[in-house]
Design a protein with these regions (language model features):
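Bacterial N-terminal signal peptides that target proteins for export
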Residues: 1-10
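N-terminal signal peptide c-region/cleavage motif recognized by signal peptidases
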Residues: 17-21
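Extracytoplasmic "Venus flytrap"
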Residues: 29-52, 60-71, 91, 157-161
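An alpha-beta-alpha
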Residues: 49, 135-166
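Periplasmic-binding protein-like
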Residues: 83-90, 110-112
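Flexible loop/hinge segments that line or gate small-molecule binding clefts
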Residues: 102-127
Length: 166
C-alpha cells in the first residue's frame, strides 16, 4: 500500500521545496533506526534514498542508529559535513533532531512521524497508515464471534493514536 510512499515524498520535497543550482552541490543525509535490509520501515526509506541518488543528488546514510545520544551525534556529524537536507527516520529522533537543528539554521531537517517543529528548518512527515488500519478494523469487526476486537499498540505517539482511533 505504501510501497512508493517514500519515493513520492522525497520527489515532492525536491520538486516543490528546494531550488539548487546543481544537484552535485546538494547533499542529503539519512539517519536510519534499523538496517537497510529489514524489508520494512528502513528499507522503504532506503529505496527513496536510492531514487534520489539515481537522480544525481549526492546522498549519505547511517543505519542502525540507536535513539538518544547516538542519534544526536550522527545527526550533528551529517550537519557538520555539509549536508543540506537530513532525514531523521524514527520517532525517537525527534528531540535530537530539534536540538541539532537549532545549531544549524541553514540545514533543513525532515523528521518522521514526530510532532515537534521547534525551529523553522524542521519539518515532519508521515504516511496515512490509519487508512489501512480502518479497513482492517472493519474486517476484524465483521469476523469476530464475540463482538470484541483488540489493538496492540507500542507507544502513545501521534502515529499510534491515529491508528487506534481509525
Amino acid at each position: 500500500m505504501y510501497k512508493n510512499f517514500f519515493r513520492y515524498l522525497i520527489s515532492a520535497i525536491f520538486l516543490l521545496g528546494f531550488s539548487v543550482n546543481s544537484n552535485a552541490d546538494f547533499k542529503v543525509g539519512f539517519v536510519y533506526v534499523g538496517p537497510t535490509g529489514d524489508h520494512g520501515w528502513t528499507f522503504q526509506h532506503h529505496e527513496g534514498r536510492n531514487a534520489v541518488e539515481a537522480a544525481g543528488i549526492k546522498t549519505t546514510f547511517v543505519e542502525s542508529v540507536p535513539e538518544g545520544a547516538d542519534a544526536e551525534r550522527v545527526i550533528r556529524q551529517l550537519a557538520q559535513s555539509g549536508h543540506d537536507l537530513i532525514f531523521t527516520t524514527s520517532f525517537g529522533y525527534m528531540d535530537p533532531t530539534n536540538k541539532v537543528a537549532k545549531d544549524f539554521p541553514n540545514v533543513k531537517f525532515e523528521h518522521a512521524t514526530g510532532y515537534k517543529r521547534e525551529h523553522s528548518n524542521v519539518s515532519t512527515y508521515s504516511a496515512r497508515f490509519y487508512e489501512g488500519r480502518t479497513l482492517l478494523g472493519h474486517i476484524a469487526g465483521k469476523m469476530t464471534k464475540t463482538n470484541t476486537i483488540g489493538y496492540i499498540a507500542s507507544f502513545p505517539i501521534p502515529e499510534v493514536i491515529r491508528g487506534i482511533n481509525a
